[in-house]
Amino acid sequence: MENIVLIGMPLSGKSTLGRELSKILKYDLIDTDTLIEEMEDKSIKEIFKIYGEDYFREKELKIINKLKKESNKVISTGGGLPIYNKNIYELKKIGFTVYLKVPLEELIKRMVKKEYDTRPLLKNNDTKFLEEMYKNRIEIYEKAHTIICNTNYKESLITIVRTYKKWKGI
């Protein structure tokens, strides 16, 4: 498959880098959270509140199955998508997985800097919860094809494109 799949913690820059990568590579962008919101005609926050997290994770799994037929896409995943149901292995079948690694301290700065009311798992800017989430997820994220330290936006873009082309044999 010739897709790039961006994974990482909430606030790691998946959506922002995804938009730029799609322009550079001339690939369509698929944001899995946005796709779910469109399918459900509800925000992620509303879906969690009305139906619960399990329902949301089922929707993510359905999207993964649909994406298996796609190519030439940049796919920006929700932070939890690779974690549940061993989805990381399915994502690796879909395309070149890139873990956007951001130090915990930087994630906390980003969270505190901006109120993230739309992210149900980051409500109330709970730094302890973010720290626990980070510790629980990092091992799975590191199963990606490559790891990019995403603290410098332009360098991250260049490195992702270069590494992806090498992976493709270009």
Swiss-Prot record:
**What UniProt keywords apply to this chain's record, in alphabetical order?**
Amino-acid biosynthesis, Aromatic amino acid biosynthesis, ATP-binding, Cytoplasm, Kinase, Magnesium, Metal-binding, Nucleotide-binding, Transferase
Chief location bin: cytoplasm
Q: Which GO terms describe its biological process?
A: amino acid biosynthetic process; aromatic amino acid family biosynthetic process; chorismate biosynthetic process
Per the entry, the cofactor note is: Binds 1 Mg(2+) ion per subunit.
Q: According to its UniProt record, which protein family does this protein belong to?
A: Belongs to the shikimate kinase family.
Main function: Catalyzes the specific phosphorylation of the 3-hydroxyl group of shikimic acid using ATP as a cosubstrate.
Q: What's the protein called, per UniProt?
A: Shikimate kinase
User: In which organism is this protein found?
Assistant: Clostridium botulinum (strain Kyoto / Type A2)
